[in-house]
Amino acid sequence: MSATAAPAATRPVISAWSAVSPYGLGAQALVDGLSSGRSTVAPVDGARWGVPEVPAHLVPGFETRQVLGKKGTRSMDRVTGLAVSVVGGLLDQPEADRERETGERAALVLGTTTGSAESMMDFTRTSLRGEAPFDVDPAVMPNAVMNCAAGQCSIWYGIRGPNTTLAQGRTAGLAALHYSTRLLSSGRAGSVLCTAAEEFSRARYWLERHSRAAEAGDDAEMALGEGAAVLLLQRPDTLSPARPALAEVLAVRTRVATGDRTRPVLEACVASALEAAGARPGDVWAASPSDAPGRLGERERQALTALFGTETVERVPGVGRLGDVSAASSTFQIAFLLATAALSDEAAGRLAVVTSADRDGSLACAVLRLVAP
């Protein structure tokens, strides 16, 4: 599949979105939460999660079996439950066309960090503690595989086209967006559910706590968050009146850099994406950084502010209000952008830039053209 930019007439468009977030279930809960500006942070139940009573941004009251029902969810882990729930939220919208959005011509792409670290560690632990290494619960084995969540989404809703999991940390959402556009432009799918999910768990808490301690300048710890977001991508010629275009994906570009090189390389990445989109910095109405913890997030925000100005960078609420949602960050950023643009008379036809930066060095930038609601 060529990464060459598609002609304007065939550039993929985003026609719908949904979310399961610390604001609640569904797109409207996110819109209402952003409008209210309310905080989603609260101390976690230490006994329930096996962690200190630290602040975190959890999806309120989310229990997989209560949300999805008891059938087929006995051994489903949290990240899979979040992913299946968010896809269902989009497919259950009144405007949805199940015939087009599921089936053999529908694809699903999911961005993640590692899948479920909790499931991987639990499965390994039982193997080490059992009388024999194979004394494990076979029902738990699928959860320990990174592509479990994506596979369950497709099985649950009958999505029989390409099914892909991309593990890329904080930039996974934009990697999934890029991959989704290539599936459409190559004709391998008629629609794509572009998804990203991140869970809160004991394993993730301790991994983040110990790994962040080694990062210079990251003394101010960001509370962990969780959730999932999904975008429906289609070719313009397959749109229906019920699902009009919300945004056109003009370009996605990536780079790699760490430390002091992050800011200049990110600026080069943004410049490359704008060039591919045939745009200039002055054309950009909103720019959304991924609010990475510590110095990395500071460098990312400084780069966008230098390119576009403070007003442009602050036009869309920061994804950091959901805490550190890691792999789900950039998909939530796009959801925030679409929610904000829908309430603005000046957004239609304007450009938006979404960037993401991961501490392992991956950088990404997407350029979108907003469409009037």
Q: Which residues make up each language-model segment?
A:
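Active-site-proximal alpha-helical scaffold in enzymes
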Residues: 83-95, 146-149, 154-157, 163-195, ...
